[in-house]
Amino acid sequence: MFDVDGVRYYADASGIRQTGWVKVSGTWYYLDPSSGVMRTGWVSVGGSWYYLDPSTGAMQTGWLQESGDWYYLKSSGAMVSNASVKVSDGTYWYMNGSGRHDKQAGIDIIMRTARSLLGVPYVWLGVYPQDGGMDCASFTWYLYKQLGIDIGFETYDQMYSGVRVFGDPQPGDIILMYYGAWPNYNPMLPEHVVLYAGGGMIYEEPTFGGRCQYVSLASKGASTTTAQRILS
């Protein structure tokens, strides 16, 4: 690296000024393809956004907080957008189209998808709407699949997704249901799962002969419920 009038460049061992990506002592830098000037801050390259340290120009990876917003940069340095990243507590952060952590944007996608599926028949072991129908667990799996999150096809997989909710559920939480009174039920085998929509309402694929519906949680008559939070 060398500076000219306060601007940084990089030349190879032959003294030839470089452009584009260069790796120096294990660190990546980006040099303007026209001028060779070392770039800093946000830069778009090949359809992806990267963040280069404002002081050193070093390409950043992992979590980045800027102006109060959180971003996630893959090991390649590329910013994650319109996708989810698993965080340390087992939940996921949804990164919106601008790359910012935006839980509400993720919830909105899930709710829009759920509304679009109203009336789809219940089909045991059905996976996708185009298969002719879905069951309760593939319904909630499909909703979270829209965010790039795999919570599993079965209720006994989904009971371990995200974190257990102690207290009132929030929109986007999944609620697992048991119908036998204690001790006549197996807490490891939930009998039903639904999406909590807020205000005491849920979206669900109900049971044989039913169709995807928007109903009250209370109407389900479950003896025991637990909730899991996937998005945070």
Spans of model-derived segments:
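Short loop segments at secondary-structure junctions
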Residues: 34, 55, 76, 180-181, ...
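Glycine-rich nucleotide phosphate-binding loop and flanking beta-alpha elements
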Residues: 17, 101, 182-183, 209
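Exposed loop/turn and edge beta-strand positions of beta-sandwich/beta-sheet ligand-binding modules
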Residues: 89, 130, 190
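Extracellular adhesion/carbohydrate-binding repeat motifs centered on closely spaced tryptophans
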Residues: 1-108
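Catalytic cysteine-centered active-site loop
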Residues: 116-171, 176-178, 182, 222-225
